[in-house]
Curated annotation (Swiss-Prot):
PANTHER family assigned to the protein according to its UniProt record, in alphabetical order: THREONINE--TRNA LIGASE, CHLOROPLASTIC_MITOCHONDRIAL 2 (PTHR11451:SF44), THREONINE-TRNA LIGASE (PTHR11451)
Designated name of the protein: Threonine--tRNA ligase
Pfam families in the cross-refs: HGTP_anticodon, tRNA-synt_2b, tRNA_SAD
Gene field: thrS
Complex formation: Homodimer.
Database matches in SMART domains: tRNA_SAD
Cofactor requirement: Zn(2+)
Any Gene Ontology biological process: threonyl-tRNA aminoacylation
Subcellular location: Cytoplasm
Function field: Catalyzes the attachment of threonine to tRNA(Thr) in a two-step reaction: L-threonine is first activated by ATP to form Thr-AMP and then transferred to the acceptor end of tRNA(Thr). Also edits incorrectly charged L-seryl-tRNA(Thr).
Cofactor descriptive note: Binds 1 zinc ion per subunit.
Gene Ontology cellular component terms for the protein in this record: cytoplasm
Residues reported in the UniProt entry to bind Zn(2+): 360, 411, 538
Length: 677
């Protein structure tokens, strides 16, 4: 006889329910519940429950709920595409940050009008209130159903497809399943290979937008066919969608590539190649200010500065393991030093040299260059080291993803007893320095071992991971797990910073490493005279100078605080006869290492002021007849407010004070507050 009731836990409360109960019945009164979490796994709302299950609701406007709704939107989009283009072949349709995409193989690239047609068809499908229904299938059944879909067949036959993050939306390691789109009459009108979960019904997709299309290689490989990737976004409400679109508009205004060109900061000449930035004088001024302050703070925290070459013999990266684990991200080798006699016979074998992708192996050689004592530990080595990483040309993006980058790279060698305290002080140092650059809203991410890509023992990884987790929790910042996200040599904490418009950027990383000291046979003489392995900590505060520059440029929308601004003071004389007085004052600022310019152009004064305002300079100094007669200058700030007739000695001290304090000043009120403190 079938069991009449089962015992389950709902929202932490024990309940007895009928054995046929699903989430539909449990949460019938709350129409915002679109799925359930059963024993920690997201499942469809109508999934059968078993005795002993723990069940929690998933609301549409929650993080999990939005992901489920966006994935359902990919199915609606794919259905719409196949209705408009019946011969379209389906790829994968994963959820991404704030949206989703689906890959299609079609005869011609989609045009903007095509995307409008697809969006209209999606609206029709959503209004038709189709239900999503899951069914499990065997591999044989799946292959039969997808006989005319070559990309789906590839996923079905690939036993490791579930390890691919994009393909994992389609393929589960446990079983294969389809989702049928069922109309009101109970007819299956469309289907897709998918692991789920999905919405109960298309009508829950209340606010969506098709955004754009782009070419993309199938499964990210240049060896595979080119697909058309259609991007979209979906939100719980129309208000949320509108807010997202507003954020996109603001982000477009702040795009560092756009600002970089407008402000004459940097460029990417075709003659040099993709992902290789050239910083112009104004951009280099910002870089220098960033690096100078970083150097100052590292000296105060007892770091030893080192410098290493840009290329090295390949054997170094054999020792470190990079050639095994990271070769695809390295530039091809240069075979050098080979010598031949007159007959072409090799008399001296050459060696493969590589552009360095990372600084850590060279820092290990510095540690190893002589015997080390426990009295020297912790030893903190620091370098602004330029590294080179091969990114596909289609994947480079402004300064945030480049091929040549400079890291503020530190490697710290300490004892296991020092490890916890060193990590704690290091995280504090990192967060304080980021705050000095104007980033104040953080959370931490803990990246743990990828079981398919790591070196070292499980015990060592567990110790390293637990120590990092403990330090992260003691910071009182939010800690988010990143399963399988660590590099092959150790777990890491990354600092995620939210910018002025709420976007999240990964900035600093702190990585614990028990592995490389073993591979390099690093040792120190302990207090008892024994030889011991040091613990190694990798740390990049900026991540890379280029990326952090881009983050700051977008965070401030080009209006850097005075200490970072490429031009800190711009002088604008009301007329030519007042220029000498202004030039004398500007010279006194330049003697204090303030970055200044004067507008000597023939433009009218009004145009000069408009041009100066567009330049985002923190201090525009104006000199007219009254200013000259009173040995004064007048300030104009970014918001248009002014302070008139400030004596030159006072003005000089106030400008230097604001620069020294590293505060943001956009108005006369900001300025007065900064100099009054």
């Amino acid at each position: 006889m079938a069991q009449a009731t089962i015992s389950i836990t709902v929202n932490g409360e024990a309940k007895e329910v009928e054995a046929t109960t699903t989430g539909v019945e449990l949460f019938a009164e709350d129409k915002n519940i679109i799925a359930v979490k059963i024993n920690g796994e997201n499942r469809d709302l109508y999934t059968p429950l078993n005795d002993g299950d723990t069940v929690d609701p998933i609301a549409l406007d929650s993080e999990d709920g939005l992901a489920i709704m966006r994935h359902s939107a990919t199915h609606v989009m794919a259905q719409a595409v196949q209705e408009v283009y019946p011969n379209a072949k389906l790829g994968v349709g994963p959820v991404i940050k704030d949206g989703f995409y689906y890959d299609f193989q079609v005869d011609q690239p989609f045009t903007p009008n095509d995307l409008k047609d697809i969006e209209k068809r999606m609206q029709r499908i959503i209004k038709s209130s189709q239900s999503f229904r899951r069914r499990s299938v065997t591999e044989e059944e799946a292959l039969k159903e997808e006989a005319d879909q070559p990309f789906k067949i590839e996923l079905i036959e690939d036993k490791e497809a579930h390890l691919d993050p994009a393909a994992a939306t389609e393929i589960s390691e446990k079983e294969l399943s389809f989702y049928d789109n069922v109309d009101r009459d109970g007819n299956v009108v469309w289907k897709d290979l998918c692991r789920g979960p999905h919405l109960p019904n298309t009508r829950y997709i209340k606010a969506f937008k098709i955004e754009r299309s782009a070419a993309a290689y199938w499964r990210g490989s240049e060896k595979n066919p080119t697909m058309q990737r259609v991007y979209g976004t979906a939100w719980a409400t129309k208000e949320d969608l509108k807010a997202y679109q507003t954020r996109l508009e603001e982000a477009a205004k702040r795009d560092h590539r756009k600002l970089g060109a407008e402000m004459d900061l940097f460029s990417f000449p075709d003659e040099i190649g993709p992902g290789l930035a050239v910083f112009h004088p104004k951009g280099a001024a910002v870089i220098n200010a960033m690096e100078d302050y970083s150097r100052e703070m590292h000296r105060k925290h007892h770091y030893s500065f080192v410098q290493t070459p840009h290329i090295t013999k390949g054997g170094l990266y054999e020792t470190s393991g990079h050639l095994h684990w990271y070769k695809d991200g390295m530039y091809p080798p240069m075979h050098l030093d080979e010598e031949k006699d007159a007959d072409g016979n090799i008399t001296k074998p050459g060696a493969d040299y590589y552009l360095k992708p990372m600084n850590c192996p060279m820092h290990n050689l510095i540690f190893k260059s002589r015997q080390r004592s426990y009295r020297e530990l912790p030893l903190r080595l620091f370098e602004f080291g330029t590294v080179y990483r091969y990114e596909k040309s289609g994947e480079v993006h402004g300064l945030t993803r480049v091929r040549g980058l400079t890291q503020d790279d530190s490697h710290i060698y300490c004892t296991r007893e020092q490890m916890k305290d060193e990590l704690t002080s290091l995280l504090t140092f990192v967060l304080n320095l980021l705050k000095d650059f104007g980033l104040t809203d953080f959370y931490l991410e803990l990246s743990t071992k990828d079981p398919n890509k790591y070196v070292g023992s499980d015990e060592i990884w567990e110790e390293a991971t637990n120590t990092l987790a403990e330090v992260a929790k003691e910071s009182n910042l939010e800690l988010v797990d990143d399963p399988c996200g660590a590099a092959f040599y150790g777990p890491k904490i990354s600092v995620q910073a939210r910018d002025a418009i709420g976007r999240t950027w990964q900035v600093s990383t702190i990585q614990l490493d028990f592995n490389l000291p073993e591979r390099f046979q690093l040792e120190y003489i302990a207090k008892d005279g024994t030889h011991q392995r040091p613990v190694m900590i990798h740390r990049a505060l900026f991540g890379s100078i280029e990326r952090f520059f881009a983050v700051l440029l977008e965070h401030y929308a080009g209006a850097f605080p005075a200490w970072l601004a490429p031009v800190q003071v711009l002088g604008v004389p009301v007329a030519d006869e007042f220029a000498p007085h202004l030039a004398g004052f500007v010279k006194s600022l330049e003697d204090e290492m303030v970055r200044c310019e004067i507008d000597y152009s023939d433009d009218r004064f009004g145009k000069k002021i408009r041009n100066a305002s567009k330049s985002k300079v923190p201090f525009i100094l104006i000199v007219g007849e009254e200013d000259m007669n009173n040995n004064a200058v007048s300030f104009r700030f970014r918001d248009g407010s002014q302070l008139n007739g400030v004596p030159v000695d006072t003005a000089r001290e106030q400008i230097l004070t604001v620069i020294k304090k590293r505060v943001q000043v956009n108005s006369a009120d900001d300025f007065n507050a900064a100099v009054a403190e």
